[in-house]
């Protein structure tokens, strides 16, 4: 599509004439047909990525379930050894994020995503056979290395198939599958613990063995269901969509943000995306949000145990807060896409997270502390797909999108490192230092979002007056 045509269509989309990108791209399909196309993309792309991501979340966070199922005693995880094992995962997970989205383009989504998923399944299986704590250290490093490419690659791939105001719901559904499965991972772990003694293996070993096998099976299935980029789908004439339907998707993306066509990879152009300050603002927000979400994911069974619940109750009570998170996530994503807003959601959820943290750390009633867990799990996890969509709504260009997906999730890895350290065993049962740290993180989210909102509003005003062109495309406006 010519650049002038793209500019004209973007101007229609953002210029206030009442039309959106779907309408601009609707040359040959009825609204009902367009919905059917989107549903097929949702089923094949979003659902597949979501199922694979859910097993990723379970595999990286099942350490806490194994810890209270006997692993700490068998491997002598005294002092800071447990936190070290949690931390080691995030070192490679963070460092290997940047090249992931480049590899995705070069290798292709099907072999790349299915291949790394199968690989970390093998590593997870190996967790069940270690006999000394330090032998698990290299396995955690390998697990982080293989999982590093998955999340940013999924964000990037999904963003190439949907227009800006379709992404929040898709990211939420993608992440919701993972969160829901993660919430019920305690139930799964409790069930696997009942295999204690089978073949002379302790219950915690069966958690790793069975979940590793499940991961490898899902990876094999995913190889046959993952879809390629829309421009490659046209070239390969996949049965997933016809060439005519793929062309409609490409035109829709071009009408929305003018970056449907992929440029030849240029390292300088890719790296130059890092000169945009807002890219690092998005990354910092994601870092601070993930600090809270990972801290809860890794330590919630242990925290509940410290509240006085039994081992079984601590495993089972993990699930309800995550069910609440899923409900809140879908409601908020619908609101965010319909009203084309993200910043107020981020600020509201961060505020709710702070309130929940205060209840967890500064009240004595078990009921109020558990209610605080509900608030923290729901609000913090709702903010994750919101910041993904916030970033995706405010950038343009395929390689910039690839760079930003990697930096976003890379900083999420840094948040994971922080989250693995904030709740320390010696701070039980109130974990005050961890509470202070996560309250600070959410306060910083509010500040950064407020600063970005002021900047975006000023830029939009200048663009309306014809004084600047945002993101190199006339008619483009920032989402606030």
Give the location of each predicted region.
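Residue-level signature of mid-helix packing/kink "hotspots" within the transmembrane helices
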Residues: 61, 90-98, 148, 182-183, ...
